[in-house]
Regions:
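Acidic/histidine-enriched alpha-helical segments
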Residues: 73, 112-130, 196, 216-228, ...
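Non-catalytic beta-strand/loop surface segments
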Residues: 1-39, 60-99, 133-185, 210-257, ...
Length: 426
C-alpha cells in the first residue's frame, strides 16, 4: 500500500499528522490530548472527562449556541470522548469545511471560558451520567470490578470521576489543569481524507500560538507506576436484577508488548465472534445467554483479557464452568490451525475494511502516536498478525491463564452462588 502519511511537530511541541485519501470529498479531523484518567491524581479523578464536557460550553469567541450552530452548519459528525490514556475531539466534514472545522475545534481546546455557572450545570449532568452507569448492570459491574482489579491505581478509578471529585471542580481548578495539561506539547492533531498537510500545519500554527504557546508545559511521561493487577473474587448481590452478570479476567499483553498480536487473536478464538468457542458453547449449543464473549483491553503498560456473560441466576454456575473449561482447553490442548486462520482472516478483513473510513484512519494515527510514538502501517500490522503461529497462541495461553492470576466478578440476585480459588483452577 502507498503510505500517504505526513508528520510535523511545531516549535511549541504540537504534533500534526495527516493521511491523504484520494477520491474523497470529506475529512475527519481530530485534536487529541495525551492525557486521560490515568494521569489524574485521586483528588482530580474525572477532570479530563469534565473538561471534555465543558469546552463545549463556550470560548472567548463563541457561545455554546454558536458552537452548536456552527457544528450543524458544517453538516459533520462531532464526537468527544475520554479514555484512560487520552482525550479526543473529532469532527468529520466536507473538504471545503476543513478550515472552519479546525478553527472551531482549536478555539474550544485553546480558549474555553469555563464560566462558573456552566461548570456547576455540567457537574449535575455528569453526576446524572454516573447514576445511569449504576443503573446499567454490566457497566456498573465493570466499574466495581475495575476498582478491585487495579486497587489504588488510576486504572482502577472511574473515567468520569466520583460525585465528590467532580463536585470540587471549580473554575480555578478546571482552568488550571487545562492550562497545564491541555497545552500544545500534549496535543496531537490528525486528519485523514482529502486534506493538505501543509494547509493543516498552517492552520495549527496560527491557532496554537500566543497565550496557548506560553502556557505549554513539557510532556511528562509519568502515567503512574505500572499497575499490579490483583486477582479478586468479587460477588456483589443485587436482588432487583433479573440477570446475573459475570466477568472473568486475567492480565494480558500490553499495547506495546511483542505478544499483543497473538493475544488479540487468541481472545478472538475464545470469544471474539459468533463462531468463537464461547458463543458456540454457551449461546448456540445451550441457549444459556444472549450476550457472551471475550476481548482484550490493551493499555500502554498492561493489558486485560475479559470474558463477559449475562445469564439467569440459576444458570450462572453452568456459564462459569463452561467459560473456565474453554480456558483450560486453551492451556491443555492446542488451538487448531483452522481456528487460527479464521481469526487471522477476520482481523485482516477488519483492517482492510477500516481503510475505507477516514474516521478509522484519523483515530489510528492519533493512537499510534500517543501509545507507540510512531506510525504503524496497515501492512506492518497485517504482517505481524500473519506471522502468529499456533505455538504462539499456546504459549500466551499457558503464560496468562493461571489459577493464581484469574479474577472474577459477579453481580445480581446471587443467593447461593459461591466461588473460591480452587474452583478457578486452570
Amino acid at each position: 500500500m502507498i503510505d500517504q502519511v505526513k508528520n510535523t511537530t511545531l516549535d511549541n511541541g504540537l504534533t500534526i499528522i495527516t493521511e491523504y485519501m484520494p477520491g474523497l470529498r470529506s475529512v475527519t479531523l481530530g485534536i487529541w490530548v495525551r492525557r486521560g484518567s490515568r494521569h489524574e491524581t485521586p483528588a482530580l479523578n474525572g477532570i479530563c472527562h469534565f473538561i471534555e464536557h465543558t469546552v463545549f460550553k463556550g470560548t472567548e469567541r463563541r457561545t455554546a449556541l454558536d458552537i452548536a450552530i456552527e457544528s450543524d452548519r458544517l453538516g459533520g459528525h462531532f464526537d468527544a470522548f475520554t479514555t484512560h490514556e487520552m482525550t479526543g475531539f473529532t469532527m468529520k466534514v466536507t473538504d471545503r469545511g476543513l478550515a472552519q472545522a479546525f478553527d472551531l475545534l482549536a478555539d474550544m481546546l485553546a480558549r474555553p471560558r469555563f464560566e462558573t455557572e456552566d461548570l456547576q450545570r455540567e457537574q449535575k449532568v455528569i453526576i446524572e451520567e454516573m447514576k445511569m452507569v449504576e443503573d446499567t448492570p454490566d457497566e456498573y459491574l465493570g466499574e466495581l470490578f475495575n476498582a478491585a482489579y487495579f486497587p489504588n491505581h488510576p486504572l482502577g478509578r472511574p473515567i468520569e470521576g466520583t460525585v465528590e471529585t467532580v463536585s470540587s471542580f471549580d473554575r480555578e481548578r478546571t482552568a488550571g489543569y487545562h492550562a497545564q495539561e491541555f497545552s500544545p506539547r500534549n496535543l496531537v492533531v490528525t486528519a485523514a481524507g482529502n486534506v493538505s498537510h501543509e494547509q493543516l500545519v498552517e492552520l495549527a500554527a496560527a491557532s496554537f500560538n500566543g497565550k496557548a504557546q506560553a502556557e505549554a508545559t513539557a510532556l511528562s511521561n509519568d502515567i503512574g507506576s505500572a499497575p499490579r493487577p490483583a486477582a479478586p473474587i468479587l460477588i456483589e448481590r443485587k436482588k432487583e436484577l433479573e440477570q446475573a452478570h459475570l466477568i472473568i479476567a486475567t492480565p494480558w499483553p500490553s499495547a506495546r508488548h511483542e505478544d499483543r498480536f497473538a493475544g488479540s487473536l487468541l481472545a478472538s478464538v475464545i470469544g471474539g465472534g459468533t463462531s468463537s468457542r464461547l458463543w458456540q458453547a454457551i449461546r448456540e449449543e445451550r441457549g444459556l445467554a444472549y450476550s457472551v464473549g471475550a476481548g482484550a483491553s490493551a493499555f500502554s503498560d498492561t493489558g486485560v483479557f475479559t470474558i463477559y456473560a449475562g445469564t439467569s441466576p440459576d444458570q450462572l454456575d453452568e456459564v462459569l464452568d463452561l467459560s473456565l473449561a474453554e480456558l483450560r482447553r486453551v492451556v491443555r490442548e492446542s488451538v487448531s490451525e483452522e481456528e487460527l486462520q479464521l481469526v487471522k482472516d477476520q482481523a485482516v478483513s477488519s483492517i482492510l475494511l477500516g481503510l475505507e473510513s477516514s474516521s478509522v484512519r484519523a483515530g489510528a494515527l492519533a493512537r499510534q502516536e500517543i501509545i507507540h510514538g510512531r506510525r504503524i502501517s496497515p501492512d506492518e500490522i497485517i504482517a505481524r498478525l500473519e506471522a502468529v503461529t499456533v505455538e504462539d497462541l499456546s504459549r500466551v495461553g499457558r503464560e496468562y491463564f493461571t489459577t493464581e492470576r484469574l479474577a472474577l466478578g459477579a453481580l445480581g440476585d446471587l443467593n447461593g452462588f459461591q466461588v473460591d480459588r480452587a474452583r478457578l483452577e486452570i
